[in-house]
UniProtKB/Swiss-Prot annotation:
The lineage of its organism: Bacteria, Bacillati, Bacillota, Bacilli, Bacillales. This is Iron-sulfur cluster assembly SufBD family protein SH2035. SUPFAM superfamilies: Stabilizer of iron transporter SufD (SSF101960). It comes from Staphylococcus haemolyticus (strain JCSC1435). One of its GO terms (biological process) is iron-sulfur cluster assembly. Belongs to the iron-sulfur cluster assembly SufBD family.
Amino acid sequence: MAKKAPDVGDYKYGFHDEDVSIFRSERGLTENIVREISKMKEEPEWMLDFRLKALKLFYKMPMPQWGGDLSELNFDDITYYVKPSEHTQRSWDEVPEEIKRTFDKLGIPEAEQKYLAGVSAQYESEVVYHNMEKELEEKGIIFKDTDSALRENEELFKEYFASVVPAADNKFAALNSAVWSGGSFIYVPKNVKLDTPLQAYFRINSENMGQFERTLIIADEGASVNYVEGCTAPVYTTSSLHSAVVEIIVHKDAHVRYTTIQNWANNVYNLVTKRTFVHENGNMEWVDGNLGSKLTMKYPNCVLLGEGAKGSTLSIAFAGKGQVQDAGAKMIHKAPNTSSTIVSKSISKNGGKVIYRGIVHFGRKAKGARSNIECDTLILDNESTSDTIPYNEVFNDNISLEHEAKVSKVSEEQLFYLMSRGISEEEATEMIVMGFIEPFTKELPMEYAVEMNRLIKFEMEGSIG
């Protein structure tokens, strides 16, 4: 017997709580708002100057003329800063009760107790809870919310901040640079290897809210770190904006894995800039799960600066009714013997649209570089669409580039075979989809793989929205 599809109320992340903020800026983006944010955070003068210059760039820069439709995004109707509590807490008991209830529903304290070396929880514009195992601090690892790192590690912070993604990079990087708040700052010292994941969780609760976290990760020579972030928001009838910037520096022989499981509600514009600089024999892995949102535009980028540097992106995108997932990856080869891999898995149903948009660039010095790209799309009905838009730039003749793209539908033969074994059509389709995404989920820690599979099943049953 076919399972009954749950309604939106069964989507456990779709709830929203009463506004418990202690400060909320006026809607719209002005110089006064930017100054107010910087003043409330008691930032140094150079950061205020950085914000104000970024604001001017934002005003001047055009909207992207490619990708999804941004015509309904109204910058004047967004709240750019909401302060939910007075301080970041290290004890879960000290987090304000209303906020704690939200994260209890999301399972954050339980997850921390089970398998995390450190966890950070951001609610609206600020990190409300942050904790890390003491032994990691003793190894010299820094894991803080980004605002605390600016106050407490200013010299290190200033050395790397905006060095990978400058404010002038694109319009939404400029916007983030003007109003950024929260995010994670991680520094792993030379030859320190961290096996247990560090996690951050980002939650938008308010309507017409903008969340603009800024994450900065530095893996020093020979270091290793695994970072996981999760993102959710309630279901509203009006739009919210998530516009983050992620900067990562992978030094010589270092390794960083950055995993994202985002599950935004379908009223969220998710417009994110993620980039890493990878030095000699460094290794950067992006593992990127894109579910939900009204529109996602996100292309994790590896700039391979040192000889032997490696970069990889493994991503999955799922687009349902009224959703556009415009995602992909960028691999910029600037040094000899560099290598990159892009594996993109996309699923569309109920008229959803998935787009793979990628760039692979081989510079003149990138002799012996190689790249392999695989794009697989599964379309579940006749209303849904998929596009693959690769862009390759080659400036030397000693490289290797392989690109494979495949679009398929669930075949009648597959369904017939499974249904002949007593499985319903709905369950058979679900089994085919789960097999399709298995190369992605097997790369996740077990707890995240279980959660990802559960979210995909909700998408299949039409419950997320």
